[in-house]
Curated annotation (Swiss-Prot):
GO CC annotation terms, alphabetical: ciliary basal body; cilium; extracellular region; Golgi apparatus; intraciliary transport particle B; microtubule organizing center
Signal peptide residue numbers: none
Gene designation per UniProt: ift57
UniProt-recorded name of the protein: Intraflagellar transport protein 57 homolog
PANTHER family reported in the protein's UniProt record: IFT57/HIPPI (PTHR16011), INTRAFLAGELLAR TRANSPORT PROTEIN 57 HOMOLOG (PTHR16011:SF0)
Organism: Danio rerio (Zebrafish)
Annotated stretches, region: pDED: 313-404
Amino acid sequence: MAEEEERGPGSVYQMFVLMEDLLDKLKVLDYEQHVLDKHNIKPLSRHYFVSSPHVLSNPGEQFYMFSVIAAWLITLCGRPFDTPQEYDDPNATVSNILSELRTLGGQVDFPPSKLKTGSGEHVCYVLDQLVEKALKSKGFAWNRPLYPSVEVEDECVQEDDAELTLSKVEEEMTQEDEEYEEEDGLDLDALKTRTNGELSGSRPAVVLESDVDAAEWNLEVERVLPQLKVTIRTDNKDWRIHLDQMHQHQDGINTSLQDAKGCLFKLREDISKTLEKVSSREKYLNTQLEHLISEYRQAQSQLNKVKELYQQASGGVTERTRILAEISEELDKVKQEMEEKGSSMSDGAPVVKIRQSLTKLKQEIEQMDVRMGVVEHTLLQAKLREKNNMTRDMHATHLLEPNAQAY
């Protein structure tokens, strides 16, 4: 099946139409007896193989139904094909069905994985191709539809009345025109002759100006205007025909309502029974799964507690991660300083400078020692000189004291 390059907005619903046609063709082949009764399967719904969010789906059941119907259709075409089982490999089943379809002349231009879901456009396409081949092998031919004859007597009467009404209107308008032309009509021949005479003359040298009086023109228009109105007379038969049609439609609606009322009541009863079954099944499932629900609630509460503990632990981990980042930053700084100091220690230039400085210090110390020795020697000589002077002065003082006593 070749994919369309441009798909219109109605292509979404084409699958529903294809499925309905497929179901009608399966009913023609009497699939209820040969497939449903044989495998103990419930009848298909109108949109069973349609893939849509508005239709309930069961991929496992739909794929099994697809494989069983496809196998039955292949056997109807005269090809031997074993009925697939639920435990068979889906890939092998799909591959066998597509190979048989190609053998029968069908076109397959999509991957086999499209059929594993059991629903969708490709599933409907494969089944439709197989059912067409089966109908062809059975020699089945569709008859032309027979359309019921429709009574059109009322419409014919209405059309005849309409034609009569229009003919009357035309006759009345013709009579009014003739009377108007006889009484107040214009002399068209004289006007035509005058116009031709003016056109045949030479072209005027100046622009012509109209000499018509506007007031007289308006009076003439007001006088002629009532005679130009067309009045269409209403036909009294129209509303009676419409009333008869309304009564006929009402009778048809009442008849159809009586026929459909029984089906609607039956449908309501079926829906009520189905709802009761669903509610009872729901209650049964609730009672069976009550302990699992309680366990689930306990597990949910434990999960919430574990989440709280995890959040607390994650908060501590975040704080420790921040501290670790700060310590790592400080460690990087220390490593950088150590590398700088190591590089400076491995360099010999500072050592040479230190040695030169030590040598210079030794020389300066020697010079200072010499200066200190000179200063000490000078100081010692000064002290000795001062001591000698003091001694001399003391001897002189002792010698002067006896002489003074003698006097």
